[in-house]
Amino acid sequence: MPQFLDTRRPGFEADFTALLGMKREDSPDVDAVVAGIIADVRARGDAAVIELTARFDRLELTPERLAFSEAEIEAEIATVSAEDRAALELAAERIRAYHARQMPENARWTDAAGAELGWRWGPIASAGLYVPGGLASYPSSVLMNAIPARVAGVERLVVACPTPGGVVNPLVLLAARLAGVDAVYRIGGAQAVAALAYGTETIRPVDKITGPGNAYVAAAKRRVFGRVGIDMIAGPSEILVIAEGAVDPDWIALDLLSQAEHDESAQSILVTPDEALGRAVVQAVEARLETLERRAIAGASWRDYGAVIVTRDLEEAAALSDRVAPEHLELCVADPEALAARIRHAGAIFLGGWTPEAIGDYVGGPNHVLPTARSARFSSGLSVMDFLKRTTLARMTPAALRAVGPAAERLAISESLEAHGLSVRARLDRLNEG
């Protein structure tokens, strides 16, 4: 059974703090192993990637077969049903339209001193997207990672997707095609991250790596950060639902289970001022678990990390939600807009009972790659901005240099950086000669 907390009871603060501090991710000490894999790929290139793929994925490859050929992609895509294709195309269209609105504008102006200032935006040159592999891989994640990159203008876009035993989800290849991916490599794990970061004889290095993965992939992304950019280190999925009133307990139960079924370490929390609703939702969850296909996973998540929290009112519920800073936040209340205005920390907010989190996973439009483990306090979900760089611009006229140059010279002297000051003074002296 999940924890059942009540803000009015003694000991709540200690219990809630313990809930926030629960270690949900099984993160074995893989760093040494990952360091060895990365070093091996850097030293031996394709040979290391091929050997590691045979060992971990039971798949024999050659340099020529590291990437799917066009013929292989076409053959796999041909097996996708018309219904699945239409659903994926709708998702791609909506994700593309949403992210197109995120594109920022360049700026240029002249300030009071006469200096021309501004900034311009430009895409990174290349990106590598990691997609967990096998039949359980998620084509929606391909769309959510690749489409923002394409909208941003990234020139070269590749996917690394392990294919254990040679098995690939055709929908992943279709998603890659719809998103405009240039190449799909059938490799995974830390070796794929290393290949994308450092390159091999066959695989060209990229500038940024995004996408989820297991502990080995996460550790590899940490290690290559600095050589390349990364999106985030994502943990187990999580959802917090604030609910009140006449909402259907079964709907809330299904929304909680939609995250619980991802992973035994996922977390689902209901916060409500209505204790009766909270207990009804618990009963509905138990009933749904009896028939849910992934009931073993969802049941373990709900049992070990689930919680129902009864509050005095919705204002208190919002305050508790901010302390959790959930990846996904559903507001199943009479006035979700008013409650959302009280929320500061959430990866994504789903407004009203007709907006289940699952819509956001697929066809809502906003990105489903979101900050977890309370990192929504200081970070945001994946967006076009993750594939753009801002370059600042400055142009001094002689008059502007006269106006601000002496202050720059004084500051350089105060920091004992002689050449800095002299570089300004030389120009000021030339102006004074005139």
Curated annotation (Swiss-Prot):
Pfam families: Histidinol_dh (PF00815)
Binding site for NAD(+): 130, 191, 214
Catalysed transformations (reactions): L-histidinol + 2 NAD(+) + H2O = L-histidine + 2 NADH + 3 H(+)
GO molecular function: histidinol dehydrogenase activity; NAD binding; zinc ion binding
Active site residues per record: 327-328
Cofactor note (record): Binds 1 zinc ion per subunit.
EC nos: 1.1.1.23
One cellular component term from this protein's GO annotations in UniProt: cytosol
Binding site for Zn(2+): 259, 262, 361, 420
Cofactor(s) needed for function: Zn(2+)
Functional description taken from the UniProt entry: Catalyzes the sequential NAD-dependent oxidations of L-histidinol to L-histidinaldehyde and then to L-histidine.
Family under the similarity heading: Belongs to the histidinol dehydrogenase family.
PANTHER family: HISTIDINE BIOSYNTHESIS TRIFUNCTIONAL PROTEIN (PTHR21256:SF2), HISTIDINOL DEHYDROGENASE HDH (PTHR21256)
Name of this protein: Histidinol dehydrogenase
Source species taxonomy: Bacteria, Pseudomonadati, Pseudomonadota, Alphaproteobacteria, Rhodobacterales
